[in-house]
C-alpha cells in the first residue's frame, strides 16, 4: 500500500496558498493511487506448482504469494497437484490456466521438455511467465519464461556436501547414502550433482580414506523415504551420513529416534526449514540444513508481475539463497517457521 507523504511547503508561501498547494498535491496523489488501485484490481496472477497440499514447504511459498497479492490488490490463485511431483497434473493445471488468459503465470519448471507446449501457448496469448522455486536447465523453456526466482541448486548442493562432510569422523571408512527424491526432475538432480561435487572434494582432500557413496531413489512421500532409507540402513549399519534433496530426511530422523539410535551416529543433511526439520535439528538428529527462503519465492514473482504490468519493468532473476543452518540457530528461526515465512 502506498502512503502519501506530506509535501514540503516553503515557509514564504502564505497559509492560504499552502492549503491550495496541499489540496492540489493531495488530489494528484489520490488520482495516482486510484489509477494504481484500479490497475492492481485488474491484475490476475496464477501460481501452478508440482507439489501437493500435503507438502509443508510449499505452504510457505503459498503464504508469500497470498500476502503479495493482497499488498498489490491482485486476484491470485495458487494451484497444487493431487500427487506430489506429478508433472502430468501440473501440465493439465497450466493448460487450464492459460486458457483463461491471466496476466501472469508463475510456475515451477521441474522438467526441461514437459512444459514447452503450454509455455508457447502462454507466450502467444501475451501472458507473463515467471518460473519460481525450480527452473529449466536447458532447452526452449528458458526462452519462454521471463525470469527465475529461486535457489541455484548445484552450488547449494555443493555447500551441503562440504558442510556435512566436515562433520565426518576423522578416522576410519566413510559410507554415504545420497537420496535423489525425484529422479529426472531438475531440482533433485542438480542438488544431487552438487552434493556429489562436495563429496568429491572431500575424497580428494582425504586420498587415504576409504569413501563409499551410494545413491537411491528416495521418493518424496515421507513413509516411503522412511522405508527405503530404513532398509538401506539395515543392510549397511556402518552408514556415516544420509543426504536428502528436500526436507524428506525428517522421516529418517524420526526413524532413527524411534530405533533409539543416538543423535549424530548417522549424520543427516538436506534442504528447507519446515517445522518438523527444525524440531529434529533441535533434537540432534539433523546436523546441516540449506535454506532457500520459500516465502520469497512466492512473494517476489507477484511483485515482478505487478511492476511489469503497471510500470513496464522487465522481470529479473532473483537468487533466494543457500543459507547454511545448524542446530545452534534453530531457536532464532523457529518463530518465523511457525508463521510459515521461513
Describe the function of each predicted region.
Residues 71-83, 177-178, 199-221:
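Short beta-strand elements in bilobed, periplasmic/extracellular small-molecule ligand-binding domains
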Residues 100-124, 195, 214-280:
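Hydrophobic alpha-helical
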Amino acid at each position: 500500500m502506498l502512503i502519501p507523504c506530506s509535501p514540503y511547503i516553503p515557509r514564504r508561501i502564505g497559509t492560504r496558498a499552502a492549503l491550495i498547494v496541499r489540496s492540489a498535491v493531495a488530489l494528484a496523489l489520490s488520482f495516482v493511487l486510484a489509477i494504481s488501485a484500479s490497475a492492481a484490481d485488474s491484475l490476475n496472477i496464477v501460481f501452478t506448482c508440482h507439489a501437493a497440499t500435503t507438502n509443508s514447504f510449499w505452504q510457505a511459498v503459498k503464504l508469500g504469494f497470498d500476502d503479495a497479492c493482497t499488498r498489490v490488490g491482485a486476484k491470485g490463485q495458487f494451484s497444487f497437484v493431487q500427487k506430489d511431483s506429478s508433472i502430468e497434473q501440473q501440465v493439465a493445471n497450466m493448460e487450464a490456466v492459460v486458457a483463461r488468459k491471466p496476466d501472469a503465470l508463475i510456475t515451477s519448471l521441474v522438467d526441461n521438455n514437459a512444459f514447452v507446449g503450454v509455455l508457447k501457448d502462454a507466450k502467444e496469448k501475451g501472458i507473463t511467465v515467471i518460473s519460481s522455486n525450480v527452473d529449466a536447465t536447458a532447452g526452449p523453456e528458458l526462452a519462454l519464461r521471463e525470469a527465475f526466482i529461486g535457489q541455484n541448486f548445484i552450488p547449494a548442493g555443493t555447500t551441503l556436501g562440504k558442510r556435512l562432510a566436515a562433520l565426518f569422523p576423522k578416522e576410519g571408512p566413510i559410507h554415504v547414502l545420497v537420496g535423489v527424491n525425484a529422479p529426472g526432475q531438475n531440482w533433485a538432480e542438480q542438488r544431487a550433482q552438487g552434493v556429489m561435487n562436495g563429496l568429491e572434494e572431500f575424497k580428494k582432500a582425504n586420498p587415504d580414506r576409504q569413501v563409499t557413496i551410494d545413491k537411491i531413489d528416495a521418493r518424496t512421500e515421507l513413509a516411503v523415504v522412511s522405508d527405503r532409507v530404513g532398509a538401506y540402513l539395515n543392510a549397511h549399519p556402518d552408514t556415516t551420513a544420509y543426504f536428502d534433496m528436500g526436507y524428506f530426511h525428517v522421516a529418517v530422523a524420526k526413524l532413527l529416534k524411534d530405533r533409539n539410535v543416538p543423535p549424530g551416529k548417522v549424520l543427516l543433511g538436506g534442504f528447507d526449514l519446515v517445522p518438523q526439520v527444525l524440531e529434529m535439528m533441535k533434537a540432534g538428529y539433523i546436523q546441516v540444513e540449506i535454506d532457500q527462503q520459500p516465502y520469497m519465492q512466492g512473494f517476489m514473482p507477484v511483485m515482478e508481475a505487478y511492476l511489469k504490468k503497471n510500470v513496464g519493468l522487465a522481470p529479473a532473476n532473483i537468487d533466494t539463497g543457500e543459507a547454511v543452518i545448524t542446530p545452534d540457530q534453530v531457536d532464532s528461526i523457529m518463530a518465523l517457521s511457525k508463521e510459515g515465512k521461513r
